[in-house]
C-alpha cells in the first residue's frame, strides 16, 4: 500500500539530502580537525563523595582533601599561565623623562590605571603561594605526625602531593624568569608613590612584600624548604613521594608526556627539598630508603625535560644545587656533560618506524572489520574481543605518548643547547639565541625525522579517532566486566576466609569495595551466598551471573575502589599487623595485578581527551621564555625561527619526494598551539599571533608549493619533448640530462578541504590560481623572449609554446585550468585585438631587420645576415632574468634546448617559415602581407622611383648591341664606356641596390610563406581525411572487386565520419559549423587558391608611372636601341654588379643576396619586358660573344673571363626567377583573357621600291 506524501514533506526530504556527507575520496594526509561536539568529562573532582556511604570513611575524608588540593593545583596552573604569558606593559607606556615634564601626572595616572589590575593579580599570586605552601606543609605535618607515620597513605594522595611539589618548582622558575613582571611592578609602584595612592602603612607594607617576593630568586623554594625542615620526619614522606614517582616511571605507569615529565621533575625537586640541614639524601640512600643510583640512571637517560611552555629544566641542576652535592659528586653520572642517545632522533627512527608499521597493521585489521564493514557498534562481541580492542586502544595511546614525548624531549634538549658558528658553519655570528636554538640547530636528517614522527603521530591520531566510538564501546564493556568480575567473583574467596577467620577490618574493607562497585544481576547482593557466612560453595557450585553492560564507573567510584584495594596490599597499616598478611599469596597477586591494570581506566574512559593530550605538540610554537630574553627587542620572532614553518619549509626547499605527502602535518602544529592558547592558556593575543603567522606561512606555503608543482611539470614536459637522439649523443659524451625525479604532488593536489585554524581551505583551488598565473607568465615570458630577439628565434618560440602546451595538459589532469588557447591568446594580447604580439613582432622584425639586413641564397633556400649592414641593428628590449622553470623547466634543459636551437640562429629558412605559418595563422599572415605590400609600394613609388628617374637620365639615349666582329674585349670596352655614368653613380651600389634588395626580400618572403603554408595545409588535409570519409584507394588482388573493398573500408571508418554524426546528434548551430568546416578543409587546396598571384598583381598596380615603360616607341612597335625602358636600366645595373670585385671587396651577392635579382626580375616580368630583356641585355650579349671567341683579357681593370662567368651565374638565376614568376603570372593571364591578342604589321618595303612607288 502506497503512502501519500505531501509536497511540503517531499521538499523537506529533499532539503535533508544537503546534510548527507558526500565523501570525495580525498587522500588523508592531514591530522583530524577539532571536533565541534562537546567532550564529555565525567570527572566530578570527588563532588559525589558523600554518596558512597558504604565506603571507608577515612578514604571519603581523603577524597575531600584531594578535591580541595586539586582545586588549588588548578589555581596554581592559572598563575603559571599568567606568569608565562606575561608581556611587559611598562615598555609600551610612555616614560616620564624628567620631573618638569608637564604631562607627567597624566602619564602616571594612565600607568596606574593600566597596571593596577595586573599588580592585583601579582598580589593574589603572592598570597596564593603562601597559602599553597602552608597547605602543603600542613598536610606533610599531619601525615608525618608520630601517631600517623605508619598509617596507610594512598598512591593517589602521594601523587597529588607530588603535583604540588611540581607546581612549586614551575611557579618559582617562572617567577625567576620573568623580568617584565618586576619591571611592570616597579613602574606601577613608582607611579603610585608619585600619586600617593599607597598612603596607609598596610598598602606600603604589602607593596614592599611584593617587591621583595618578586626580586628574590627561588623565594618559593626557600620558603617551602624552610617550613618543611621544621616538620619532624618530613623527609620520610618526601621519600615516599619520590619512591612512588620512581616506581611509576620505571613501570611506565603514566600515559601523557606531561605525566612522564612531571614524575621526573618531582624526583629531582623532591631530592632537592629532602637534602638540607636536617636530612641527607645520601644517608637515606645508604639506608635503602631511596635509590639514588636508579634516579641517576633516569636523569642520565633524560637530561632535559619541559618545565612550562618553551622553558626547560636540566634535571641534574636539582642535584647540583642540593646541600650535600659537592662531597658526593662522584656518585652522580647525570651531572657529567654527555649527550644521551635518547636525543639522537635519527637513530631512534628505526625502532619508531618498526613500532608504527606493526601497530598500524594491527589497527587496520580491526578498522576494516569495525569501521569499513560497519559491524562495529551494531554487533555484540565477546569479552575477549572487547579486551583485545581495549588493549589495542591502550597500546595506541602509549605509542602516541611515547613518540610525542620523544619529539618534545629532543626539542627541549635543543633549546637548552643552542648551536653556534663553530658547530654549524651556516649559523652567522650575529644570530639570536632563539634562532641558534631552532633555525640552525637541526640537521636536514633531524628535520626529516621530526616531520616523519609528527606525521606518524597525527596519522595514527586520525585512524584512532575514526575508531573512537568502537573503542569507547569496548573500553566501557571491558572496564565494567573487569570491575564486576573482580568484585563479585575474585573477592568472594578472600571474603569467605575473612568471615571464617573473623577478620573484621578485612571484612569491612572487602564489603565496602563490593558495595561501592558491584552491579548485581537482580539489583541486590544474593543473600544466600555461602561466602557471606564463611561457608564453602555447594558441590554443584554457587552460580553468580555477572551482567554485561557498556557502563564505566564514575571517577570517585574508581578512586574509592582502587584506594581500598591498595589499602589491602599496602605495607603500611594503622595497626601493628598489615591487612596484606591476612590475605593469601594468589589473592595478593590478583589484587596487585588488578590495581596496576585499573590505573589506566581513568584515561581510557576519557579516550577522546587522552588521545588529544597524547598527540599534543603545541609547545613547539610557544616562545615566551625566549621573547623575554630579548628584553623587548623583539615583539615576536619571524617565521624563519618558528619550528612549524622550519619543518614545512625544509620539505619544500629540499623537494624530497618521500616527505612531500607529509607537508601538511607540520602546519597542524599551529592548530595544536592555537587550541592550547584558547583552551589552556586562554589568551586571545597568543591566538592572534598564531593566526597572523599562519596567514603568512600559508601564503608562503601555497606560493612555494605552486611554484614547485609548476616547475616539476614544466621540467617533465621539457624532458618528454627533448630530442631522444640529442639526449643519447649527450650521454655518449658523458653529459647526463636527468629526468625530473618522480614526486608526490598528485596527493596534495587532491586536497579540497584542508583544516587550518578552523578554516576549510581548498588547497587545489589556491594552487590552481597560482599555477594559472604562472602558466600565463610562462607564455608571456616566451613571447617576451621572442620580442627581445630577431626573427630566427621564432622556432624556439614554437617549442617553448609546445612545452607549455604539454605542461598545461599534464596539469589539467589534477586541476581545472582555462583552456591553453585562451591562455595563449591572453598572453599574446590577441583576445580582442585582430593580431597579437607575435604577429606584430614578426612584422617589426621583417620591416626593421629582415628586409634590409638579410641576403637570400637560392641554392640553400635560406636568408642569412648581410656581411655589410646598410642600416643600424634595431634596438630590442633585453629579456628579463627569470627562473629556469619559466623557459624549458630546469637549467640543464635550458642549456640543452639552447644548444639545439642555436643551429637555427644564423639563418631564416623553411623551418622558420613553417613556424611563422603555424603561429600566425591565416589572419596573421594576411596582416603581415598587407603591411609588406605597403612597404613595397612606398619603395616602388618613392625611393626606387626617384632613383629610376635619375638613372634613366644618366643612361645613354641610344645603346646598340655591337656586332660580333668587334670581339668580346671590344664589346666589353664599348659597354664600359657607354655605361660609365651608371658605373660611377655613387649611390647605385648602396641605396639603390639596398632598396631593391628590400623589395626582393619582401617578394621572396611572400613566396616562401605560401610554399610553407601549402605544406601545412596538405598536412591538415591528410590528418582530416579519415574524419571526412576521404579514404585512399586500396590494393586489390587479382579477381577482387575494388568497389567491394572500398565499401568495406568505408563501413570501417564510418564511425569517424564527423559530419553525419553531428547531423544526427548535434544542434542546428553545430551542424552548420561542421558543414562549413568540412567544406573549407576540402576546398581550400582543391580550388587552387594562390596568395602569391595576388601579391604580384598588387605589386604590378604600383608600377603605373610612365618612367617604367618609357614613351611610346617611334616605330610604333617597340624600343630597340633606345634606353628608355626599365629593362634597359636593369641591364645596366646587372652589368655593374657582374663586374668582378677586388680581393678584399664584397660581391653584390654577399651584400645583397638574390633578393636584388628577384626585385629586378619581378619588376621586368610585371612590366611585361622579359623577352626584350633577354634579347637586348648587355651582359647576355657580351656572354654570347665571349663564348664564341673564348678570349680572356683585362679591359679597364675588368677580367673578361671572370665577368663572363659571373654573367652566366646571374643568367641562370634570372631564368629561374622568370620561370617561377611566369608560373604564377601565366595563370593570371589565362584567367583574365583566353584570346591571344595578335597585331598585324605590313610587310617591310625596300627603300628603292618605296621611292619608285
UniProtKB/Swiss-Prot annotation:
One cellular-component annotation, GO: cytoplasm
A Gene Ontology BP annotation from the UniProt entry: cell-cell adhesion
N6-acetyllysine: residues bearing it: 1037
Keyword Acetylation: yes
Subcellular location: Cytoplasm; Nucleus; Cytoplasm, Perinuclear region; Synapse, Synaptosome
Functional description taken from the UniProt entry: Involved in T-cell adhesion and p53-dependent induction of apoptosis. Does not bind RNA. As component of the WAVE1 complex, required for BDNF-NTRK2 endocytic trafficking and signaling from early endosomes.
Protein name, UniProt field: Cytoplasmic FMR1-interacting protein 2
Name of the gene encoding the protein in the UniProt record: CYFIP2
Amino acid at each position: 500500500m502506497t503512502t501519500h506524501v505531501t509536497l511540503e514533506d517531499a521538499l523537506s526530504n529533499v532539503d535533508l539530502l544537503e546534510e548527507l556527507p558526500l565523501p570525495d575520496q580525498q587522500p588523508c594526509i592531514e591530522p583530524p580537525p577539532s571536533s565541534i561536539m562537546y567532550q564529555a568529562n565525567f570527572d566530578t573532582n570527588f563532588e559525589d563523595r558523600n554518596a558512597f556511604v558504604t565506603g571507608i570513611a577515612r578514604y571519603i575524608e581523603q577524597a575531600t582533601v584531594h578535591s580541595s588540593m586539586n582545586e588549588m593545583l588548578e589555581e596554581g596552573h592559572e598563575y603559571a599561565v599568567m606568569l608565562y604569558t606575561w608581556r611587559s606593559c611598562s615598555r609600551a607606556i610612555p616614560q616620564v623623562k624628567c620631573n618638569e615634564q608637564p604631562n607627567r601626572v597624566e602619564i602616571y595616572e594612565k600607568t596606574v590605571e593600566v597596571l593596577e589590575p595586573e599588580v592585583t593579580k601579582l598580589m593574589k599570586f603572592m598570597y596564593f603561594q603562601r597559602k599553597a605552601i602552608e597547605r602543603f606543609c600542613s598536610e606533610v605535618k599531619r601525615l608525618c605526625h608520630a601517631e600517623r607515620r605508619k598509617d596507610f597513605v594512598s598512591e593517589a594522595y602521594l601523587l597529588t602531593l607530588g603535583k604540588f611539589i611540581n607546581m612549586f618548582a614551575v611557579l618559582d622558575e617562572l617567577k625567576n624568569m620573568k623580568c617584565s613582571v618586576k619591571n611592570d611592578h616597579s613602574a606601577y609602584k613608582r607611579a603610585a608613590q608619585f600619586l600617593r595612592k599607597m598612603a596607609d602603612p598596610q598598602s606600603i607594607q604589602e607593596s614592599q612584600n611584593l617587591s621583595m617576593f618578586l626580586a628574590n630568586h627561588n623565594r618559593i623554594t626557600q620558603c617551602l624548604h624552610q617550613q618543611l625542615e621544621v616538620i619532624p620526619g618530613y623527609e620520610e614522606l618526601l621519600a615516599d613521594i619520590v619512591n612512588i614517582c620512581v616506581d611509576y616511571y620505571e613501570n611506565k605507569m603514566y600515559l601523557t608526556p606531561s605525566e612522564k615529565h612531571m614524575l621526573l621533575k618531582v624526583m629531582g625537586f623532591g631530592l632537592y627539598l629532602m637534602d638540607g640541614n636536617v636530612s641527607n639524601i645520601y644517608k637515606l640512600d645508604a639506608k635503602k630508603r631511596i635509590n639514588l643510583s636508579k634516579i641517576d640512571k633516569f636523569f642520565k637517560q633524560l637530561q632535559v625535560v619541559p618545565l612550562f611552555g618553551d622553558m626547560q629544566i636540566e634535571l641534574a641542576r636539582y642535584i647540583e644545587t642540593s646541600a650535600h652535592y659537592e662531597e658526593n659528586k662522584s656518585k652522580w653520572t647525570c651531572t657529567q656533560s654527555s649527550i644521551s642517545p635518547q636525543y639522537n632522533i635519527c637513530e631512534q627512527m628505526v625502532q619508531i618506524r618498526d613500532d608504527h608499521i606493526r601497530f598500524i597493521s594491527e589497527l587496520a585489521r580491526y578498522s576494516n572489520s569495525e569501521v569499513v564493514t560497519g559491524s562495529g557498534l551494531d554487533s555484540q562481541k565477546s569479552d575477549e574481543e572487547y579486551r583485545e580492542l581495549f588493549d589495542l586502544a591502550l597500546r595506541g595511546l602509549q605509542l602516541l605518548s611515547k613518540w610525542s614525548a620523544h619529539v618534545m624531549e629532543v626539542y627541549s634538549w635543543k633549546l637548552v643547547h643552542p648551536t653556534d658558528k663553530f658547530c654549524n658553519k651556516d649559523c652567522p655570528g650575529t644570530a639570536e639565541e632563539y634562532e641558534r636554538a631552532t633555525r640552525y640547530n637541526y640537521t636536514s636528517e633531524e628535520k626529516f625525522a621530526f616531520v616523519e614522527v609528527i606525521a606518524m603521530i597525527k596519522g595514527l591520531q586520525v585512524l584512532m579517532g575514526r575508531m573512537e566510538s568502537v573503542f569507547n564501546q569496548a573500553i566501557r564493556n571491558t572496564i565494567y566486566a573487569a570491575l564486576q568480575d573482580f568484585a563479585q567473583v575474585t573477592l568472594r574467596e578472600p571474603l569467605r576466609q575473612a568471615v571464617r577467620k573473623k577478620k573484621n577490618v578485612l571484612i569491612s574493607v572487602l564489603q565496602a569495595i563490593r558495595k561501592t562497585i558491584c552491579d548485581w544481576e537482580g539489583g541486590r547482593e544474593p543473600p544466600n551466598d555461602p561466602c557471606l557466612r564463611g561457608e564453602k560453595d555447594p558441590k554443584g557450585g554457587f552460580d553468580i551471573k555477572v551482567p554485561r553492560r557498556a557502563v564505566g564507573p564514575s571517577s570517585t567510584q574508581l578512586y574509592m575502589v582502587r584506594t581500598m584495594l591498595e589499602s589491602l596490599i599496602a605495607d603500611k597499616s594503622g595497626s601493628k599487623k598489615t591487612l596484606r598478611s591476612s590475605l593469601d599469596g594468589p589473592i595478593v597477586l590478583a589484587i596487585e595485578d588488578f590495581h596496576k591494570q585499573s590505573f589506566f581506566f581513568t584515561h581510557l574512559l576519557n579516550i577522546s581527551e587522552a588521545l588529544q593530550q597524547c598527540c599534543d605538540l603545541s609547545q613547539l610554537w610557544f616562545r615566551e621564555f625566549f621573547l623575554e630574553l630579548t628584553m623587548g627587542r623583539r615583539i615576536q620572532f619571524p617565521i624563519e625561527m618558528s619550528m612549524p614553518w622550519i619543518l614545512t619549509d625544509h620539505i619544500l626547499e629540499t623537494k624530497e619526494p618521500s616527505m612531500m605527502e607529509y607537508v601538511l602535518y607540520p602546519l597542524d602544529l599551529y592548530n595544536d598551539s592555537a587550541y592550547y592558547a584558547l583552551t589552556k592558556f586562554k589568551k586571545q593575543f597568543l591566538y592572534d599571533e598564531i593566526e597572523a603567522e599562519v596567514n603568512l606561512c600559508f601564503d608562503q606555503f601555497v606560493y612555494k608549493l605552486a611554484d614547485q608543482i609548476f616547475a616539476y611539470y614544466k621540467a617533465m614536459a621539457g624532458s618528454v619533448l627533448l630530442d631522444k637522439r640529442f639526449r643519447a649523443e649527450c650521454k655518449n659524451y658523458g653529459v647526463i640530462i636527468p629526468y625530473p625525479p618522480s614526486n608526490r604532488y598528485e596527493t596534495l593536489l587532491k586536497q579540497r578541504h584542508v583544516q587550518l585554524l578552523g578554516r576549510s581551505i581548498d588547497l587545489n583551488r589556491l594552487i590552481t590560481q597560482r599555477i594559472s598565473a604562472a602558466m600565463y607568465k610562462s607564455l608571456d615570458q616566451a613571447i617576451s623572449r621572442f620580442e627581445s630577439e630577431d626573427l630566427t628565434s621564432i622556432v624556439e618560440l614554437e617549442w617553448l609554446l609546445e612545452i607549455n602546451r604539454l605542461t598545461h595538459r599534464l596539469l589539467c589532469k589534477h586541476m581545472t585550468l582555462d583552456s591553453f588557447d585562451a591562455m595563449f591568446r591572453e598572453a599574446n594580447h590577441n583576445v580582442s585585438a585582430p593580431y597579437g604580439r607575435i604577429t606584430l613582432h614578426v612584422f617589426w622584425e621583417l620591416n626593421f631587420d629582415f628586409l634590409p639586413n638579410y641576403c637570400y641564397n637560392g641554392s640553400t633556400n635560406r636568408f642569412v645576415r648581410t656581411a655589410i649592414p646598410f642600416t643600424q641593428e634595431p634596438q630590442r628590449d633585453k629579456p628579463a632574468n627569470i627562473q629556469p622553470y619559466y623557459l624549458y623547466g630546469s637549467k640543464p634543459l635550458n642549456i640543452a634546448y639552447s644548444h639545439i636551437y642555436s643551429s637555427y640562429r644564423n639563418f631564416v629558412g623553411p623551418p622558420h617559415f613553417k613556424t611563422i605559418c603555424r603561429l600566425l595563422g591565416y589572419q596573421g599572415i594576411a596582416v603581415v602581407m598587407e603591411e609588406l605590400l605597403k612597404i613595397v609600394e612606398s619603395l616602388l613609388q618613392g625611393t626606387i622611383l626617384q632613383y629610376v628617374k635619375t638613372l634613366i637620365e644618366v643612361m645613354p639615349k641610344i645603346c646598340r648591341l655591337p656586332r660580333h666582329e668587334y670581339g668580346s674585349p671590344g664589346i666589353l670596352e664599348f659597354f664600359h664606356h657607354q655605361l660609365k655614368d651608371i658605373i660611377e653613380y655613387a649611390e647605385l651600389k648602396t641605396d639603390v641596390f639596398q632598396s631593391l634588395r628590400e623589395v626582393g626580400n619582401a617578394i621572396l618572403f611572400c613566396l616562401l610563406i605560401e610554399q610553407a603554408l601549402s605544406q601545412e595545409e596538405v598536412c591538415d588535409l591528410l590528418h582530416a581525411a579519415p574524419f571526412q570519409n576521404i579514404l585512399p584507394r586500396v590494393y586489390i588482388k587479382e579477381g577482387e572487386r575494388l568497389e567491394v573493398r572500398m565499401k568495406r573500408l568505408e563501413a570501417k571508418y564510418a564511425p569517424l565520419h564527423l559530419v553525419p554524426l553531428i547531423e544526427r546528434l548535434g544542434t542546428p548551430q553545430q551542424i552548420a559549423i561542421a558543414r562549413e568546416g568540412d567544406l573549407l578543409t576540402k576546398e581550400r587546396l582543391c580550388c587552387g587558391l594562390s596568395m602569391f598571384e595576388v601579391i604580384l598583381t598588387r605589386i604590378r598596380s604600383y608600377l603605373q608611372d610612365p618612367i617604367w615603360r618609357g614613351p611610346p616607341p617611334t616605330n610604333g612597335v617597340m624600343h630597340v636601341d633606345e634606353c628608355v625602358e626599365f629593362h634597359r636600366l636593369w641591364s645596366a645595373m646587372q652589368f655593374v654588379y657582374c663586374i668582378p670585385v677586388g680581393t678584399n671587396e664584397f660581391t653584390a651577392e654577399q651584400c645583397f643576396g638574390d633578393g636584388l635579382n628577384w626585385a629586378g626580375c619581378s619588376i621586368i616580368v610585371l612590366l611585361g619586358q622579359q623577352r626584350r630583356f633577354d634579347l637586348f641585355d648587355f651582359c647576355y650579349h657580351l656572354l654570347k660573344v665571349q663564348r664564341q671567341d673564348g678570349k680572356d683579357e683585362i679591359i679597364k681593370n675588368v677580367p673578361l673571363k671572370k665577368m663572363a662567368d659571373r654573367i652566366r651565374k646571374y643568367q641562370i638565376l634570372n631564368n629561374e626567377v622568370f620561370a617561377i614568376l611566369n608560373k604564377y603570372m601565366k595563370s593570371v593571364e589565362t584567367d583574365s583573357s583566353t584570346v591571344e591578342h595578335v597585331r598585324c604589321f605590313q610587310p617591310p618595303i625596300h627603300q628603292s621600291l618605296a621611292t619608285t612607288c
